[in-house]
């Protein structure tokens, strides 16, 4: 599991919340105080809560659980995609379509269309139609890939979602709640911590902070996956005892 210290969090600015006038009173237990009308998050709470979330993530990864990273705002989207790809998981980084989880049957049809178009773009089909038709198909492919490219190989709903900004991604959280999918979320001082299984109080705007959370999550998932490989090898008799 990744080990994130209080110093790491301080350097990344995890402790800086939003302006005091935008606060959500439900975040009061996680707020240390205010400085220059900006709330300061209590990292003595954040560190163990984040470690608890990572521990859960590692357990899920060790059982081949599918993790969906969600972060569609500009500050998070690139880092979300990068982290998910680095640990061979899934992501939504552009826009959350209503029903992305709760209406999976329809989403699956759109994913099939995306994959068909990908094949057609490679096998010369686009060259056999008129320029106008080829352009329309290329645009459709681009649009579908932007929205569904990060989940096209997920093969069903995820086992856990990891969210950057609970307020911005409230629809994703609600859908996960409806399906009983555990939610890990970074929750800033302006957001509501309700209906989140693993609340991580922290700055959800600073790119350095966002990268810190995501890199730690990706490292943890990889560690969990390695555990699964070792256990599997032991069960299959591939691991030999090394005598002294």
Swiss-Prot record:
GO biological process: translation
Family: Belongs to the universal ribosomal protein uS2 family.
Any GO molecular function: structural constituent of ribosome
Domain of life (superkingdom): Bacteria
Lineage summary: Bacteria, Pseudomonadati, Pseudomonadota, Gammaproteobacteria, Alteromonadales
PANTHER family the UniProt entry points to: 30S RIBOSOMAL PROTEIN S2 PROKARYOTIC AND ORGANELLAR (PTHR12534), SMALL RIBOSOMAL SUBUNIT PROTEIN US2M (PTHR12534:SF0)
SUPFAM superfamilies, per database record: Ribosomal protein S2 (SSF52313)
Name of the molecule in the record: Small ribosomal subunit protein uS2
Any Gene Ontology CC annotation: cytosolic small ribosomal subunit
Keywords: Ribonucleoprotein, Ribosomal protein
Pfam families, sorted: Ribosomal_S2
């Amino acid at each position: 599991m990744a080990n994130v210290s209080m110093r790491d969090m301080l350097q990344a600015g995890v402790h800086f919340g939003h302006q005091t006038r935008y606060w959500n009173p439900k975040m009061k237990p996680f707020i240390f105080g205010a400085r220059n009308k900006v709330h300061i998050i209590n990292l003595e709470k954040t560190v163990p809560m984040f470690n608890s979330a990572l521990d859960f993530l590692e357990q899920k990864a060790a059982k081949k659980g599918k993790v969906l990273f969600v972060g569609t705002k500009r500050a998070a989207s690139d880092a979300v995609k990068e982290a998910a790809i680095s640990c061979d998981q899934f992501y939504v980084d552009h826009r959350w379509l209503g029903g992305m989880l709760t209406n999976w049957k329809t989403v699956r049809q759109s994913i099939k269309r995306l994959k068909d178009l990908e094949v057609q773009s490679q096998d010369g089909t686009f060259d056999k139609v008129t320029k106008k038709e080829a352009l329309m198909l290329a645009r459709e492919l681009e649009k579908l890939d932007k929205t569904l490219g990060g989940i096209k190989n997920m093969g069903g709903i995820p086992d856990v979602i990891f969210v950057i900004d609970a307020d911005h991604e409230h629809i994703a959280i609600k859908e996960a709640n409806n399906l009983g999918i555990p939610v890990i979320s970074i929750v800033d001082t302006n957001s509501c911590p309700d209906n989140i299984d693993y609340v991580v109080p922290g700055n959800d705007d600073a790119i350095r902070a966002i990268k810190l959370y995501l890199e730690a999550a990706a490292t943890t998932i990889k560690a969990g996956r390695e555990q699964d490989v070792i256990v599997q090898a032991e069960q299959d008799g591939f691991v030999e005892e090394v005598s002294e």
